[in-house]
């Protein structure tokens, strides 16, 4: 938006934006503005509000080391870069002090250069390096749509890969553009130690709470393996089985079975 306002032309190569000096200036301005606005929102503490008595501290800094993407398809991407390293130890120290760590899509090289990074890359690499339990992406769409355009409630990594294969280049069925950015990142994170990745809408009020604290959620959950699996019962399960069938036995729906009989079966 800043580039458009300034009349600066946007150039892309293979889906990557070329960040020249003018574009980098706009990126720095936008990142600084957003950071200040987020800090202001987290500083709210008015009485008789949900934030009453809150004492939240926000930490930001040069936690992300970046490197240039270089030349792609014969074009120098200039200040467009990728994550080289996340200073996970420094971030953990801040988290141990109960700070919220704010990472921007800007990284710095050991020579002091500034690079424009993709927010998906920063979020994914940070989640991996911190061994996060969850990685959450807020999107314009509700989640990952299936063939009937309903939203997949949950996908394993293998199922998510199949979705991408069936909707890739040359396929008649296409995914929403933001899903094509975030779903591969969710797959990467879940194959490198992150337990769960969530893709949810940023437009739905209460989406984050609904996704995290309800069984079905409101978006798409990506996990390394299925959340629910079937297995043969063992003797350790007898107590739980008795608890499940007792009401049915009491109502005459099932014939009563003793613990000894269940253990034998």
Predicted regions and their residues:
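Conserved N-terminal entry element of GNAT/NAT acetyltransferase domains
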Residues: 213-235
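Nucleotide/pyrophosphate-binding catalytic subdomain
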Residues: 1-196, 203, 231-240, 245, ...
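Glycine-rich anion-binding loops and their surrounding alpha/beta cores
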Residues: 151-152, 209-217
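Active-site or pore-adjacent capping/gating segments
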Residues: 194-199, 204-210, 221
């Amino acid at each position: 938006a800043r580039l458009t306002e300034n009349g600066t032309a946007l150039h892309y190569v293979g889906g990557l934006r070329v960040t020249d000096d003018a574009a980098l200036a706009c990126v720095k301005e936008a990142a600084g503005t957003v950071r200040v606005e987020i800090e202001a929102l987290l500083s709210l503490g008015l009485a008789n509000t949900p934030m009453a008595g809150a004492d939240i501290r926000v930490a930001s800094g040069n936690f992300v080391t970046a490197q240039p993407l270089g030349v792609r398809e014969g074009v120098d991407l200039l200040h467009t870069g990728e994550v080289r390293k996340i200073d996970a130890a420094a971030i953990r120290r801040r988290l141990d002090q109960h700070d919220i760590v704010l990472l921007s899509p800007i990284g710095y090289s050991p020579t002091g250069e500034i690079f424009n990074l993709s927010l998906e890359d920063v979020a994914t690499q940070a989640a991996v390096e911190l061994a996060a339990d969850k990685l959450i992406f807020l999107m314009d769409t509700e989640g990952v749509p299936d063939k009937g355009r309903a939203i997949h409630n949950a996908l394993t990594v293998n199922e998510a890969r199949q979705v991408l294969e069936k909707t890739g280049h040359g396929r008649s069925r296409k995914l929403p553009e933001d899903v094509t950015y975030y779903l591969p990142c969710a797959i990467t994170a879940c194959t490198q130690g992150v337990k769960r990745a969530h893709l949810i809408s940023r437009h739905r009020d209460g989406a984050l709470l609904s996704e995290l604290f309800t069984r079905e959620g409101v978006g798409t959950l990506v996990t390394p393996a299925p959340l629910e699996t079937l297995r043969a019962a063992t003797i350790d399960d007898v107590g739980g089985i008795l608890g499940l069938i007792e009401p049915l036995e009491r109502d005459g729906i099932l014939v009563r079975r003793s613990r000894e009989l269940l253990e034998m079966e």
